[in-house]
Amino acid sequence: MTDETTQNIKDKTEEELAALLDQTLGEFTATPAPKPRTTDDELDELMASADQEAAQKAAKDFQKMLEQMVTLQEEAMKKAGADPSEGEGEQPLDPNDPEALAMMDALKQLMECSSNVANASNPEEFMAGLDMLRSPNSPMEPFMSMIMQTLASKEVMYPPLKEIFDNYPKYLEDNGAGLDAETKERYEKQFEVLGKICTEFEKQPELAEVQPVDAATQPAPEADPASIEHFEKLGKLLVELQQYGYPPKELVGALPDGWQIDESGLPKVADAAAATEACSIM
């Protein structure tokens, strides 16, 4: 073996040994790998992150609903301003009415707050948005009180939901065989939740009649614990019901003009002018 070949082998061996030494030293000096997330604190942190993601998704859905409400209200006010004589026999909508303007302002402020929650990039921004939404001095509080009272009102919510619930078994019996498995399961879940909502209404005492205008302009009266619990249960059930999309048109009729079903199976405004016209006809 020549001296040159021997030297090459020696150099290569030294390089390999140096690399192995560097690797070994690196394993000793490297930052330790993080431990598995098994402690209670880490589990709480993980759950908080999941809760924030869920809340942000809900805020985005809520913001979409508010945008539709604002669009419809603006279209109605624009239409009333352009042709105040239209809709004779009904209470005309005054585009300069202080209460209507206050409602629009509250809706837009509520949209801004929900946007802060939905688009928060860190936990601090997320909590700040939530604090703004639930502040007792929030200008949206009267509007939110109106929504809460309306949702909890047996007179407003119960009759149409009860009618759908009562007619659902016959619909499933007549049409169940022709539905795909996913749609049939969704309708069955919808029927189940509707039953829970109706039961909740039926076991509650009669609630005071809701006056939307008064509720939107005055602080809500102090609610008793039973009413608060009633609303919380209804709120959760209504959110769950929404997850199963629009009921069969055979039970509720086709969507009004100007509306269409979105990718999640829920109704949304597609044409504000047509939707406003449909609302005025109902």
UniProtKB/Swiss-Prot annotation:
Pfam families: Pex19. GO terms for biological process: nematode larval development; protein import into peroxisome membrane. The keyword Lipoprotein applies. It is found in: Peroxisome. Residues 73-95 are annotated as: Disordered. The keyword Lipoprotein applies. One of its GO terms (cellular component) is peroxisomal membrane. The modification Cysteine methyl ester is found at C279. Transmembrane segments: none annotated. One of its GO terms (molecular function) is peroxisome membrane targeting sequence binding. PANTHER family: PEROXISOMAL BIOGENESIS FACTOR 19. This is Putative peroxisomal biogenesis factor 19. It comes from Caenorhabditis elegans. The lineage of its organism: Eukaryota, Metazoa, Ecdysozoa, Nematoda, Chromadorea.
